[in-house]
Amino acid sequence: MILVDANQVMIANLMVSLSQTEKLQEGLVRHMVLNSLLNYRSEFKKKYGELVLCYDNRHYWRRDEYPHYKGTRKRDREKSKHNWDNIFELLNKLKAEFLDHLPYKVIEVDGAEADDIIAVLCKQQGLANIRLQNNLQPPVKTLILSGDKDFIQLKRYGYVDQYNPCLKKWVEGLDPKLYIAEHILKGDRSDGIPNFLSDDSCLMEGRRQKSLAKVKIAKWSTLSPEDFCTTTELMNQYRRNQKLIDFEFIPKDISEKIIDTYESLVPANRSDLSSYFEENELNDLVSAVNYF
């Protein structure tokens, strides 16, 4: 299967459209996103199977655990020249259209991000591949379409490839075990997660994080946290990052909802796609409908 980080694909296309014209153009964004999906399917379906569009839900379980999660993004949007209320309104409209009209599984789960959906489905396929190989059958390959390096850790399951559609290059060459160990230590500033030496509020309050030297990262990434977390505070901050960053810590109830939703989804009928394109004046896509 081809797991598409749909939020990333949509926002990337939307930002390209805004670079061409300052006004948000619904028709242009719709066409660009659909054309991107057509290109992905044409290039990768033969090797990896069908597209699965994975979306963020408005409610994140990580924010329940850590209120500052992605808090810096909201602050940055408030400083942006773009009207993000209008942008999110358009993205939600297109998501609803795709659910109703595209012949793929379009999945959104309460409490989950697209990252969670992709991680859970990769793990599920990894377990299925073990059973297939035990029965002397070939494993099923999975492709992640996203530039997010968080997904490097999913290569631990085997037969998982990642392609960055924005840079048009494969994401490879990094050891998933070492990557996740370093990522937990360093945190993720873009998600509002400080390094494990720093307290919860430092990024939101604009304070500098405590210095974490590269030599320490190189050493500690090969050790158990019990070997270098010398205080309860440090251990708690390490566990904070581990829970937020390592996909193995996705809550069981979220994982079960993702699997149940995926297995129960029935894609829209491909035969109805032409009328959707015609209604939205996507005339050049009508002729390519059989390739969707």
Predicted regions and their residues:
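Non-catalytic nucleic-acid-binding/docking modules located in mid-to-C-terminal regions
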Residues: 42-55, 76, 82, 123, ...
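Noncatalytic, basic helical substrate-engagement surface that gates or grips nucleic-acid strands
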Residues: 1-143, 156-169, 246, 252-253, ...
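Short, polar loop motifs at secondary-structure junctions
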Residues: 146-151
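Short acidic/glycine-rich loop or secondary-structure boundary segments that cap or lie
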Residues: 152-155, 211
